[in-house]
């Protein structure tokens, strides 16, 4: 759920050793990221964290208060200090351990707590190195209920300072997948020299096949690196195992080939089959490791999704909302995010149709059940989501008829890992919103257009739903999803829907030609880009994609704006040490999708002009995603020697359970997020340069999640790159 909002906390101390390891040990305003057992409710009271301890438990760990994700180093001593009181004279246990199986205890000490505040100090040694440490207070076994309060919690120790100890590998950064024979080929080198330095291109046998000297790009603000560029674009011999060397530093290996992205084109799209809800994921298509039973089809222990009620007080009916895609790290399904993802897949289809990139339109391109049905696989996959979106529409005869429910998800967060078929949480429809309704209208109108040649009945159903949603949005133009509705799923709050009105009107006009929609087409593309919350740019992108469907003045204006924004994105690439079309002082949640979405705009500019510079800029954007960045990190699972493998999610949790697989090849990680919006990021990345605020850890949901609208953008770009 890429929109989960979390209080950003800094460690209690960032000075000299001993290093502070606890986040928020003073509880001045909030208890996050501290937690308590379900039977032990806790709250902040007068700057203390207080927990109501129940009676009648047996084991010490039956009632607990704690903080997870504490980094520990094997063989290092740690000192735990805290001040505590209780409403009864009790003896608790305080200690340090492992937050995940096998729940190893580093030390556990008894503390006699009374109503008089007392400060305790305990010391012990960690037996292992981990990012999964846990400070805990255990209360189980109490004969009578009481309240325990704690303040000024501190854990100090370890030799590695917070934010330190990072290994970025070689300073020579390349696209770890490879380069197209006729495309640009550059490497970024971290080197303090202010004058050019020599480089060598070596083949798989170590033979030097090309030499040159770097160009000094200089200080790169986003990464904090001083960067040189090595350009070997005129070397075109195909092969694998190439490396680029600068002195004794050698890059990760890479290839040179005519189509380095053909595999990624497939894998990034097949991701969507793997996140389908309401259907078995068949080993015949994905292999045994990724196969699983259907989730959320009303089979116990599931409590959804064939008859899902509304949250109490919001409606009195239930809907069958089975199907669709699981959104991100959770197993919720969200109209605003899902509609954008479906739009990008359908837009990739329309783009390939208009440019003659026939390989992207194959039936049988993907390993999916629909292969062989004489429909392009990319449309089959988008249909799986669109059919779910249609189910989210409020039925006739009900209040807010024609609007779309904002989302459906669990009542509370499920644990990691949780397989969809094992989810026992109640699931609820959340109230309709204008944003969701317009997203449905846009995606359904596009669906009607692209499905007309293949399934006229389905196309007609989509168009009817789109028109109904449009009228419902006009009747209810300011119904907003609450930002605080973020328990059990992301909020996806949006209180400015002028851009959604514009997008929906554009798609409806493109499909129907009805001029009444023109006056609502006010959205414009800007260098700020687009996202699930900001869809105004999609007006210009759709007009530019389908110029024959729009008035000439609209086409000329959209074309001019798309080219202007694309030029800015190209300048972003050229002005940075690493080729990212996204440039900002701070990196947001899901920054990888800012890269892919901006690259989509550049690719559209190429389609409009066929200028090679735009194509090259898209390919260089792929360089950034696949390792040519400040982290020397490929953000795409399965692609590159240093690829992300531990993305946040409940299904593919190999980091927590070795019996489970890693995320599938072609999964895009969220990428650097300089706001550090989860405890793992806060513990391990304080002081990071914006472009380096990333950690490949399953619990870092703010830097390392996957999401359907991020992978749809990657799939769009991969399809473009595979054709170039």
Where are these regions (language model features)?
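Secretory targeting and sorting signals
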Residues: 1-15
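Aromatic (Trp/Tyr) and acidic
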Residues: 176-248, 258-260, 270-343, 347-348, ...
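Short, compositionally biased P/S/T/A/G/V-rich stretches that sit at domain boundaries
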Residues: 166-177
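Short beta-strand edge segments in extracellular beta-sheet folds
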Residues: 155-156, 255-261
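Carboxylate/His-rich catalytic cores and anion/metal-binding grooves
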Residues: 376-400
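Extracellular and organelle-lumenal recognition/adhesion modules and their flexible linkers in secreted
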Residues: 16-164
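Structural beta-strand segments of beta-rich domains
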Residues: 78-80, 170, 183-187
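Short Trp-Ser/Thr-centered turn/loop motifs at beta-strand boundaries
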Residues: 67, 108-110, 246-254
């Amino acid at each position: 759920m890429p929109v989960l909002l979390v209080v950003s906390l800094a460690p209690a101390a960032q000075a000299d050793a001993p290093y502070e390891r606890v986040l928020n040990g003073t509880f001045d305003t909030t208890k996050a990221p501290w937690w308590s057992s379900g039977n032990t409710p806790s709250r902040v009271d007068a700057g203390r964290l207080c927990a109501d301890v129940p009676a009648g438990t047996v084991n010490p760990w039956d009632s607990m208060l704690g903080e997870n994700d504490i980094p520990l180093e094997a063989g290092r001593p740690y000192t735990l200090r805290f001040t505590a009181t209780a409403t009864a004279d009790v003896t608790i246990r305080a200690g340090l351990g492992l937050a995940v199986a096998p729940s190893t205890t580093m030390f556990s000490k008894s503390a006699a707590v009374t109503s008089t505040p007392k400060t305790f100090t305990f010391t012990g040694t960690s037996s292992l190195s981990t990012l999964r440490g846990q400070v805990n207070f255990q209360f189980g076994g109490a004969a009578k209920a009481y309240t325990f309060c704690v303040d000024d919690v501190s854990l100090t120790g370890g030799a590695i300072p917070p934010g330190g100890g990072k290994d970025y590998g070689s300073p020579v950064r390349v696209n770890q997948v490879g380069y197209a024979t006729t495309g640009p080929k550059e490497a970024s080198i971290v080197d303090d020299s202010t004058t050019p330095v020599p480089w060598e291109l070596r083949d798989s046998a170590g033979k030097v096949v090309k030499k040159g000297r770097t160009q000094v790009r200089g200080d790169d603000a986003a990464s904090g690196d001083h960067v040189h560029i090595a350009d070997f674009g005129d070397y075109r011999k195909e092969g694998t195992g190439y490396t680029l060397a600068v002195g004794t530093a050698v890059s990760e290996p890479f290839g040179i080939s005519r189509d380095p992205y053909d595999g990624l084109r497939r894998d990034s799209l097949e991701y969507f089959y793997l996140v389908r809800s309401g259907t078995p994921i068949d080993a015949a298509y994905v292999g045994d490791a990724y196969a699983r039973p259907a989730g959320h089809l009303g089979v116990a222990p599931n409590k959804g999704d064939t008859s899902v009620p509304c949250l109490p007080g919001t409606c009195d009916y239930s809907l069958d909302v089975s199907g669709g895609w699981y959104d991100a790290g959770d197993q919720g399904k969200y109209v605003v995010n899902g509609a954008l993802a479906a739009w990008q897949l359908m837009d990739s289809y329309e783009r390939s149709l208009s440019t003659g990139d026939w390989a992207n339109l194959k039936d049988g391109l993907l390993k999916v059940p629909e292969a062989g049905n004489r429909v392009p696989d990319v449309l089959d996959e988008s249909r799986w989501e669109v059919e779910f979106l249609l189910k989210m529409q409020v039925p006739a005869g009900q209040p807010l008829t024609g609007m779309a429910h904002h989302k459906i998800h669990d009542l509370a967060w499920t644990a990691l890992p949780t397989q969809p078929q094992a989810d026992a949480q109640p699931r609820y429809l959340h109230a309709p919103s204008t944003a969701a309704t317009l997203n449905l209208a846009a995606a359904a109108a596009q669906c009607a257009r692209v499905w007309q040649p293949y399934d006229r009945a389905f196309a007609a159903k989509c168009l009817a739903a789109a028109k109904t949603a449009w009228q419902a949005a006009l009747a209810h133009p300011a119904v907003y999803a609450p930002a605080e509705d973020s328990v059990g799923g992301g909020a996806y709050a949006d209180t400015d829907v002028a851009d959604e009105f514009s997008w929906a009107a554009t798609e409806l006009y493109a499909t129907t030609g009805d001029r009444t929609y023109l006056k609502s087409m006010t959205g414009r593309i800007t260098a700020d880009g687009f996202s699930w919350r900001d869809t105004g740019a999609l007006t210009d992108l759709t007009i530019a994609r389908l110029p024959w469907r729009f008035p000439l003045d609209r086409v000329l204006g959209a074309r001019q704006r798309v080219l202007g924004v694309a030029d800015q994105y190209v300048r972003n690439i050229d002005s940075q040490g690493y080729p990212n079309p996204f440039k900002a002082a701070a990196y947001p949640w899901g920054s990888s999708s800012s890269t892919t979405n901006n690259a989509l705009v550049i690719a559209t500019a190429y389609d409009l002009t066929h200028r090679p510079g735009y194509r090259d800029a898209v390919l260089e954007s792929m360089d950034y995603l696949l390792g040519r960045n400040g982290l020397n990190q490929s953000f795409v699972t399965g692609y590159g020697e240093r690829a992300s493998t531990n993305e946040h999610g409940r299904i593919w949790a190999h980091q927590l359970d070795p019996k489970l697989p890693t995320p599938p090849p072609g999964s895009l990680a969220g990428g650097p997020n300089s706001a550090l919006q989860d405890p793992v990021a806060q513990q391990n990345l304080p002081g990071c340069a914006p472009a380096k605020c990333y950690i490949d850890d399953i619990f870092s949901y703010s830097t390392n999640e996957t999401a359907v609208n991020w992978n749809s953008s990657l799939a769009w770009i991969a399809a473009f790159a595979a054709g170039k």
